[in-house]
Amino acid sequence: MELLKQLYQIHSLSGFEKRMGKFIRRWIRKNVPDAICQTDKLGNIYVTRGKAEDYPCLASHIDQVQKTHSEDFVCIESKDIILGYSPRNRRQEGLGADDKNGVWIALKCLKEYECLKAVFFVGEEKGCIGSSAADLTFFEDCRFVVQSDRRGYKDLVTNIGWNELCSREFLADTEYEKFGYQPHDGMITDVGELKERGLAISCINLSCGYYEPHSDEEFTVKKDLLNCLALVRHIIENCTKIYPHINNSDCFDDEREYMHWEQYDEMSIIIDDILAKYPNVTAECLKEYYGIHYDMLTLEEFRQLLNEAKENIVEPGVLEEPIPFI
């Protein structure tokens, strides 16, 4: 787990990922010297190892949400979990395990497999900035793309909103059940952005063992991370053909409208719960915490939802602590 803890030690706030990118490139040069590593103008890193007609491909993102990362930040590792801590400030601090866990999996596999592609995106937490401008020709000889960027331990994301990510054949061939995974709908991430841009191969996003993401209470359960790595290895070794997939939606605009109102309704429930406990919360604060995953809602809609929810408050309270990420 030494490499994982080295990744956790690097603060890589969205928009300030250069240090992480430099670490990844140096690590690859030292540990996978035969790999070809290229970086685009945004900072996305594209890695190809070996020569083959087609490649398995892994994706991850190198930015994180947490703004606090003290100079004395350390990783505390127990038998089951890893968390971040500042001894001087006597407080827990976020690891950035979303998505350093995915970066770790990709680096481990690059070292292990002689023919593999991997891509490390910038700016995922700010709306998939890197993947929205990524070079799609990099994926032309890929069999599939697997991203490890989901909280928990059992989700295999096959749909993001109404955007299907993979073929049934690929899903079956992954044999995900052997590893305790289940198909699940997910939220915006890089493979979803690639599919929206027209990537015509199967993609999935896997739970990779981090919990309480985007918060200072974030932690990693090691056995869940290792189980994700085991599934990724299994897919690389057993899914040895190209798995084409095109999301043919004739009613995309209608689906997006439905998704928008679905997000609106979900956020209405969330704000009701939040406001009952934190009556001083602002629309700007809600947008900052939830806007990444409720990306179809505008700031004005957050204001509207907040005003509607205020009418339902029974007992006002006092905002004494940060809003927990849901």
What are these language model-derived features?
Residues 30-39, 77, 81, 177-183:
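Short secondary-structure junctions
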Residues 91-169, 178, 183, 190-191:
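Acidic/histidine-rich catalytic neighborhood of metal-dependent amide-processing enzymes
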Residues 48, 52-115, 125:
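Active-site metal-coordination/substrate-binding segment of hydrolases
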Residues 279-301:
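Acidic, low-complexity, intrinsically disordered interaction modules
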Residues 3-6, 10-53:
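A non-catalytic alpha/beta surface segment that caps or lines the substrate-entry region
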Residues 182-228:
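Zn-dependent metallopeptidase/amidohydrolase metal-coordination segment
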Residues 212-280, 307-324:
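His/Asp/Glu-rich mid-to-C-terminal helical/loop segments that flank catalytic regions of hydrolases
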